[in-house]
Design a protein with these regions (language model features):
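Alpha/beta-hydrolase active-site loop signature
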Residues: 1-2, 24-28, 68, 92-93
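A catalytic-pocket lid/entrance helix-loop region that shapes and gates access to the active site
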Residues: 81-134, 186
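The serine-hydrolase catalytic nucleophile loop
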Residues: 1-13
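Short glycine-enriched nucleophile-adjacent loop
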Residues: 69-80, 86
């Protein structure tokens, strides 16, 4: 949900690879920002194929991390004749077990302070389903509440992206957090 950053180029040696980085619908520089309209997994897979066609690439190596790894797998299944290799890192396939671990407290055992900050945003009677509780607020009518919950969601995700629980990436900017959280929660 965060879009591409210049640091993502570090995975590719430009002397050997033509790297194509793109922001999926609603993320990064993609417009409309933070939109979930016409933004299904299969819309994203179709977008990848349109990018390949537009660039005139016959076959390519497909690389993806986290949610991008899931999209890469689905793209390779839909278009096996276009994929020479898959390179996947930090694979997240959005299974019930993965979602329960990330948003049901499992990961919180490793990052207890960050988990408390994330989960305590929601009233106790709604904590049995944090994804749904956050969804109501991320897509609700109150703009200030949307931003507050988006920053909490992005902060939790950021905590999970580092090896040292004491390491902090700081508080994400509101616009980034809103797009990131809405797309991930969607």
């Amino acid at each position: 949900g965060g879009g591409c950053s210049p640091g993502m180029r570090r995975f590719f040696d430009p002397r050997h690879y033509r790297a194509v980085l793109f922001d999926q619908r609603g993320c990064g520089r993609s417009t409309p920002n933070a939109s979930v309209e016409n933004n299904t997994t299969w819309d994203l897979v179709a977008d990848i194929e349109r990018i390949r066609e537009a660039l005139g690439i016959e076959r390519w190596i497909v690389f993806g991390g986290s949610w991008g790894a899931c999209l890469a797998l689905l793209y390779a299944q839909a278009h096996p004749e276009r994929v020479t290799r898959l390179v996947l890192r930090g694979v997240f396939t959005m299974t019930r077990a993965e979602l329960d671990w990330f948003y049901g407290g499992g990961a919180g055992a490793f990052w207890p302070e960050q988990w408390q900050a994330f989960s305590q945003m929601v009233p106790a009677e709604e904590r049995h389903d944090l994804i749904a509780a956050y969804h109501r607020r991320l897509f609700g009518a109150d703009a200030a509440e949307r931003v507050r919950f988006a920053r909490a969601w992005a902060g939790w995700e950021s905590a999970l992206a580092v090896l040292d629980p004491g390491e902090s990436r700081g508080s994400p900017a509101s616009g980034y957090a809103l797009a990131f959280a809405r797309l991930e929660n969607h």
